[in-house]
């Protein structure tokens, strides 16, 4: 976990797009604990405002450095207002749609949201002189490589619209750096984020049917689904199931701290890509067994056919990030499953349903230490918050801005 410290050069203000999402919310918490000020923008399309409230509660006194605006990046006018109110030192860009299957069915939606939204963001950043960016890319840009470990030099051949949108944005970033060397950009290619904050109060809350393995496993464990369907058990792997590189979401969040520090400390970073993974492959069955051990629950299995296009084995070589960002994943599969189960057992139906009820003796939110559980604001948040897309909330009284948009 990130230690509390101030980044070189003093406290800096960072815009976090998609900061209410799974990875984004964990990154916002780590940013606050590392001494940054974080302003979250999110359209809440596939995320929950309750995640931001829980970040505030977990951040304690650091929550005074947190603000939220409900903004869709495709609404350039709303984004302009956010930049007009605050001077940002850098942007961490998570916002985007991320379901591979949905991207195949609705490619235009993905290009509009992921690409057009990013173009708006980059244009507004440039207009306001903010030219430091950490972009949430994906290992999906590699497609289905035949060999592993996967390095940053592997061919970029995404095989679905989601991965293609990530590559398009990467290409845009490389193009704008070539035309304007003042830009400093880091592209972080994640492998498979799993786990949850060790407190059990932040985690993945997928809307609808989960798109990834771990949330599906957790839903079976808490009784929301009868069984887990494994897509293929005839791969040339140690147990016949696909092998992937799973990374704890807190390790991933800390990778963003390391990337930001690199942007601030380096005079000539340019536009660089880094893999964020553990460098170790874990099979589907190994994940299931580790989760059963962590939860004490038996996961019923159904063996289904392979999914077209899935690689047998895909894991990272994170040596470049270890060397240049001074970052290395700390958590193993057992810790990932432990924290995932801690989250799932406290929040079996995600954020919404348990913020107003008690289950198994636990208050999913109130036990952190403060807030009301009736849908009103919580620790660090103003009772009279306006949700009009223009006001940070909880910070209007405790972190007013001066005329230049800085926090006091």
Curated annotation (Swiss-Prot):
It catalyses: UDP-alpha-D-glucose = UDP-alpha-D-galactose. GO terms for molecular function: UDP-glucose 4-epimerase activity. GO terms for biological process: galactose metabolic process; monosaccharide metabolic process. The keyword Isomerase applies. Residues 369-408 are annotated as: Disordered. Signal peptide: none annotated. Pathway: Carbohydrate metabolism; galactose metabolism. GO terms for cellular component: cytosol. NAD(+) binds at residues 13-44. Its cofactor is NAD(+). This is UDP-glucose 4-epimerase 2. It comes from Oryza sativa subsp. japonica.
């Amino acid at each position: 976990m990130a230690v509390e410290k101030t980044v070189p050069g003093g406290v800096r203000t960072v815009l976090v797009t998609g900061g209410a999402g799974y990875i984004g919310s964990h990154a916002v918490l780590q940013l606050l604990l590392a001494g940054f000020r974080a302003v979250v923008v999110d359209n809440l399309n596939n995320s929950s405002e309750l995640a931001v409230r829980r970040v505030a509660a977990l951040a304690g006194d650091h929550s005074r450095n947190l603000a939220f605006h409900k903004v869709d990046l495709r609404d350039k006018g709303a984004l302009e207002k956010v930049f007009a109110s605050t001077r940002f030192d850098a942007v961490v860009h998570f916002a985007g749609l991320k379901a591979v299957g949905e991207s195949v069915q609705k490619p235009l939606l993905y290009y509009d949201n992921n690409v057009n939204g990013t173009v708006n963001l980059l244009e507004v950043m440039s207009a306001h002189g903010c030219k430091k960016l950490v972009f949430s890319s994906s290992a999906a840009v590699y497609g289905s490589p035949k060999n592993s470990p996967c390095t940053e030099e592997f061919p970029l051949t995404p095989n679905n619209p989601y991965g293609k949108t990530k590559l398009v944005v990467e290409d845009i970033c490389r193009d704008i750096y070539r035309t304007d060397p003042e830009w400093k950009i880091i592209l972080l290619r994640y492998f498979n984020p799993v786990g949850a904050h060790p407190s059990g109060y932040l985690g993945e809350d997928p809307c609808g049917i989960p798109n990834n393995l771990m949330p599906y496993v957790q839903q079976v464990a808490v009784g929301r689904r009868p069984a887990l369907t494994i897509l293929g058990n005839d791969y040339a792997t140690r147990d016949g199931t696909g092998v992937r590189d799973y990374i704890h979401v807190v390790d991933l969040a800390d990778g963003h701290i390391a990337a930001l520090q690199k942007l601030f400390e380096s005079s000539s970073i340019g536009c660089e890509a880094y893999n964020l993974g553990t460098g170790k492959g874990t099979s589907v069955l190994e994940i299931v067994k580790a989760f059963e051990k962590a939860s004490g629950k038996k996961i019923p299995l159904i063996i289904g056919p392979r999914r077209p296009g899935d690689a047998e084995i895909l894991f990272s070589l994170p040596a470049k990030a270890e060397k240049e960002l001074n970052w290395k994943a700390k958590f193993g599969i057992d810790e990932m499953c432990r924290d995932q189960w801690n989250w799932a057992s406290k929040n079996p139906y995600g954020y919404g349903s348990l913020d107003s009820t008690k289950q198994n003796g636990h208050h999913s939110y109130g036990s952190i230490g403060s807030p009301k559980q009736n849908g009103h604001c919580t620790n660090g948040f103003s009772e009279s918050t306006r949700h009009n897309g223009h006001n940070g909330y909880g910070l209007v009284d405790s972190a007013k801005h001066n005329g230049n948009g800085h926090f006091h």
